[in-house]
Amino acid sequence: EPEAPAAPEAPVATEAPVEEPVEEVVLNPYLGSNKLDGNGIPQTFFDDVHVRRAFAYCFDWDVMIDEVYMGEAIQSKVLSLPGMPGYDPDAPFYFNDLEKCAEEFKLADVDKDGVPAGEDPDDVWEMGFRVQMLYNTGNTTRQIMAEVLQANLAEVNEKFSVEILGLPWPSYLAAQRAKKIPIMTGGWLEDIHDAHNWYQPYTTGTYGARQNMPDDLKTQFKALLDQGVSLVDPAARHEVYKQFNQLYYDTVPGIPLVLATSHGYEQSWVEGRIMNPIFSGIYYRTVYKTDAAKDPTSFTDATIGDLDTLDPALSYDTSSGEVIQNIYETLVFYDGEATDKFVPQLAESWTTSDDGIVWTFNIRQGVKFHEGGDLTPTDVAYSYWRGLLQGGYSSPQWLLAEPFFGVGVDDITLLVD
């Protein structure tokens, strides 16, 4: 009897080979090679406080004040302005000292191997670096600031290379918001005339967020900010901000440069310009021409750059702000040059509760939008809600979010009636 054929063996199940996930390497175009190899810097380059101190000692304030500002500026030793809590002419500050710059670079440990760079042939002092420093095109003052730093760093060590790159204003802002810029020059136009509006943006707010400041350092700054803004006694606030000044000096998240004494210039036949430090550029409403003007019908104004946005909920740059403040009406507006006195606009009156927590604005009757609809309190409330929903550190909405949602011991309720 023929033998029955053997039953076929079932194929052995095999698992498909597991491929290791490929880690995507995202290079920053402004960091050269993105390595500590003399042709770039790693993304952690400025983590080292000695590197930050070295850069501070390499700047030359005298050159900027004497040759660029023609004497119409003073060195900024702290972030707040004269007359504000925290302003202290005796605060510790950095100054131009190329020997100290070299000392700090030799103390750095950029490759994080525990050996100071001055004793490590694979660290920044021997390897050198190449990095791009950015400014907004057309701002020659910021360009020269970068050139001063570039020249001094090259004098300290010929292997230190800073390439200066100018970007159009909107692109400059976009690069900041993308947290791509390793080192840049910037400034601040205050939102409110208060020390908090100078200390917050450079640490926990706009600039602090854009520069990837470590969370532990931001936490230290925030504790002092919350304490300072919750106090009403100027002397008590001053003591808190003095601690802030010391922390900022010790950790060097930025280098305070100069405070211009701010002169305004216009043609002799232009009158009515108001110099208020909170204005975004020029407030056109008060400006007029005398009979001496050759063309009484036109007004030409030079701004710092192209507009970024005309949405008042998102705009947080001077160029856009100048246009917005001249085409939109606000509830109240500043009274001339005063930073603490106001005149009615869309709100015909307002009251404040005894504890300062509740502010009630009475909306002017008969105001119409350009398309013909009436302005109502609901429209005003919508503007607040819309802004807060779109907020972020690159918009002005933190000015509302902090008091509305709580900072320190604040508890403010918005009433619309």
Pin down the residues of each PLM region.
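Append "and occasionally in soluble cytosolic enzymes with long acidic Gly/Pro-rich linkers
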Residues: P21-S33, G40-E155, K218-Q220, Q243, ...
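Short, well-ordered beta-strand elements
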Residues: M127-T137, V162-L165, D295-D306, V358-F361, ...
